[in-house]
């Protein structure tokens, strides 16, 4: 799904679930176009409109103008569409924005100085390939459209994490594809990269272990520490779908001043494949998967020093 903010209002939109019965029992995936909002002081979510079509698995970016829902996919395939969701007097306005140059799902975005940067993702369904391309849109001047920038020097990836801290963008982990026995096989990545518009890409120390699909854009503390909360560390491979206990319940942090990785301890609500946004002095992680095919309706938040 997509989630972010417009002013003091949190907006959630789109997504998928299995409403009738679980995926492992043959349940059919359902796509939704519904939009919900939550404002300070309210006790619950308000349904506030619909997307132009049911979408999911795109990137979310909170800008001064509102929440950008970028790319993703629907039943018909991967999408180039970009929409701005803004709020006024409790209503949500959906405004078409310049489309992506290519269709992308399972991509990631972060905002730096009013500009939205998008990296990676899959161009076609069924994970046939993934890209290392990078695009940028100035949300204050959307008529200029998306500009392609220097690609990530590392592997193409999807379900990776992005963050922006102190004028620097970070691309962390994710999933790459490698041919194995004539087929494309998933490979979790420990690569970490930073990017500045002035200096381009820089390789960072390897992550202690691979993480994909953690809440993104990832939370960043006031002193520039980036947190990867939960996500998929690949440990579920040793279980059957029926015995899978759920996703990684540990967290990692990157101290961007010392450029060092550290364990950050266990988390209460491990999830994967979910958006995250700053809201009311906290970081909110919205819905996501408890384990493959099992969705959560919960929203959890964390306060960072």
Language-model segment annotations:
Residues 1-305:
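Kelch-like beta-propeller repeat domains
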């Amino acid at each position: 799904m997509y989630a972010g903010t417009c002013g003091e209002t949190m907006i959630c939109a789109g997504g998928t679930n299995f409403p009738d019965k679980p995926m492992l029992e043959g349940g059919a995936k359902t796509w939704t176009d519904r939009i919900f909002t939550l404002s300070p002081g309210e006790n619950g979510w308000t349904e506030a409109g619909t997307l132009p079509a049911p979408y999911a698995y795109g990137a979310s970016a909170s800008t001064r103008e509102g929440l950008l829902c970028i790319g993703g996919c629907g039943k018909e395939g991967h999408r180039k569409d970009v929409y701005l969701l803004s709020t006024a007097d409790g209503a949500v306005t959906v405004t078409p924005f310049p489309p992506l140059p290519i269709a992308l799902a399972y991509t990631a975005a972060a905002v730096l100085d009013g500009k939205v940067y998008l990296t990676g993702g899959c161009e076609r369904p069924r994970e046939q390939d993934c890209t290392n391309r990078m695009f940028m849109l100035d949300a204050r001047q959307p008529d200029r459209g998306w500009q392609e920038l220097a690609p990530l020097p590392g592997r193409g990836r999807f379900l990776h994490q992005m963050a922006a801290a102190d004028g620097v963008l970070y691309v962390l982990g994710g999933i790459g594809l490698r041919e194995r026995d004539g087929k494309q096989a998933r490979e979790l990545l420990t690569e970490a990269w930073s990017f500045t518009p002035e200096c381009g890409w820089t390789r960072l120390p390897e992550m202690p272990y691979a993480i994909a699909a953690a809440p993104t854009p990832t939370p960043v503390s006031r002193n520039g520490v980036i947190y990867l909360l939960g996500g998929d560390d690949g440990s579920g491979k040793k279980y059957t779908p029926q015995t899978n206990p759920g996703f990684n319940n540990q967290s990692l942090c990157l101290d961007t001043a010392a450029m060092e990785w550290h364990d950050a301890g266990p988390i209460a609500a491990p999830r994967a494949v979910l958006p995250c946004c700053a809201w009311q002095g906290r970081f909110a992680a919205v819905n996501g998967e408890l384990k493959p095919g099992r969705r959560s309706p919960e929203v959890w938040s964390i306060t960072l020093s």
